[in-house]
Amino acid sequence: MGDVVMNERELILAIETSCDETSAAVIENGTTILSNVVSSQIDSHKRFGGVVPEIASRHHVEQITVIVEEAMHEAGVDFADLAAVAVTEGPGLVGALLIGVNAAKAIAFAHQLPLIGVHHIAGHIYANRLLKELEFPLLALVVSGGHTELIYMENHGEFEVIGETRDDAVGEAYDKVARTLGLPYPGGPHIDRLAVNGEDTLQFPRAWLEPDSFDFSFSGLKSAVINTLHNAKQRGENVQAEDVAASFQASVIDVLVTKTKKAAEEYKVRQVLLAGGVAANKGLRTALEEAFFKEPIDLVIPPLSLCTDNAAMIGAAASIKFKQQTFAGMDLNGQPSLELEND
C-alpha cells in the first residue's frame, strides 16, 4: 500500500456488526452521510428474550455482502472512490465482530485501501458529529444495553471515563424490568411508552453512591421493581404496569441527568453529548433538554436513527483516525472487551 492521498472528498466505507445489527455506510469528510444501511435482527431474537450470539453471527454472514453493496450503490460510489475502510473492532460479541472485521479486511486488501479499527462506543459518541462539529472540552453520556458511562474528552480521540456503572447497564435494567412486566424484547421502548401514561407513585430508590462519585448502580433499583411486583402478586394486589414503568424510569432518569449535569459543571465542558441505544428514550431526551435549557452548555442529542447501532457513526469516528493516519494492519481482530480510553 502506497502513501495515503488526502483527497478533498474523503469517502470512508464503514461496517458495524458488533451485536445484532448488520450495517454499512459511506461517510464523506466525517460529517456527511451518503448512505447508512441497517439490517436489524430484533425479530429473530425476540422469542429468546435477548440476543443469541450464534444466531447473530449467522445473520451477519448472510447479510454483510448485500448490505455493503447496497450502501455503495445508495451512495453512488465505487471502491476506487474510497479513501479507507473502517470497521467496529470491539467491544461486542466476538463472533459478530469477526464477520465485520473479516469483511473489512477483505475489501481493504482487494482494493488496496487503508484499514481503520473503531471502538464501538467512540462510534456512538461521534454519531453526534454527523449533526454538528464537536466542541472541546466535552462530556458524553453513553447509555446502551451494555454500557452506562460518562466520558470526558479534551480533544478528538482522547477519552477519559469519569463515571461508569458498577453493575447493570441502563439498557440491561430496562430489559429485565420489561421481562418482569411481561413486555417483549427489547424492553426499553415499551417501558418508555408505558411510562407516559403512568405516575411516579412507587418512589423507587435512587443510587447516588458516594458524594463525589460519577458512577452508576442500577441493580438495587432493578431488584426493588422485581420485589414490588412479586410482593403485590403474592398479596393478590394489582399494580398498574404504567405506574411501575413511570416510577422505574423516573429513578433512572433522575440519576443519569443529575450526575451528567454535575459532571458537566465540575469539568467546565462546552458541550454535552447523548449517545447509545438508550439515547432514543423520549423521557431521557426531554429531561436532559429541560436540565440544560438555561445552561451555557451546548446539548447535542442525535436523531433516533443514529442512537441505535449503525455504521454511519463508525465512519464519523474513523474520519478522525484517518486524518491522524492511525491505520490497522491485516492482523486486525475482533476484541469483545476492547477498552475505550486512549483509543
UniProtKB/Swiss-Prot annotation:
Query: What's this chain's function?
Result: Required for the formation of a threonylcarbamoyl group on adenosine at position 37 (t(6)A37) in tRNAs that read codons beginning with adenine. Is involved in the transfer of the threonylcarbamoyl moiety of threonylcarbamoyl-AMP (TC-AMP) to the N6 group of A37, together with TsaE and TsaB. TsaD likely plays a direct catalytic role in this reaction.
| This protein's encoding gene | tsaD
Q: What is this protein called?
A: tRNA N6-adenosine threonylcarbamoyltransferase
Q: Which CDD domains match?
A: ASKHA_NBD_TsaD_bac (cd24133)
Task: Kindly list the positions annotated as binding substrate.
Answer: 142-146, 175, 188, 192, 281
Q: Which family does it belong to?
A: Belongs to the KAE1 / TsaD family.
Mitochondrion as UniProt keyword: no
Q: Recorded E.C. number(s)?
A: 2.3.1.234
Please classify the protein's predominant subcellular localization into one broad category: cytoplasm
| Source organism of this protein record | Halalkalibacterium halodurans (strain ATCC BAA-125 / DSM 18197 / FERM 7344 / JCM 9153 / C-125)
